[in-house]
Amino acid sequence: MQIKKEMIYRQLAGDNILVPGGNAVLDLNGLFVMTETGAFIWSVLSQAETEEDIVNKMLEEYDVDRETAQEDVKEFLGRLREYGIID
């Protein structure tokens, strides 16, 4: 998995936010507000080769079952793909 768009992660007023930077500003309109889980997935995304790598990191970090972690990862990555942020 590779991040295709330049995105800047920020925490503002307790919210986890992705802000388009560079040329991504031209392609994407607005900010992406993420849950704590989404922010965690974003933080490990650049180190992960597969969705399963991210799921395993979630299982290490959170008290969650594998099925829930898989669903959360699949949903979040699906949204990033929808907006062309990742491959």
Regions found by a protein language model. Give the residues of each.
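Long, charge-rich, low-complexity alpha-helical segments
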Residues: G30-D87
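Acidic, low-complexity/disordered tracts enriched in E/D and polar residues
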Residues: M1-A39, S43-S46
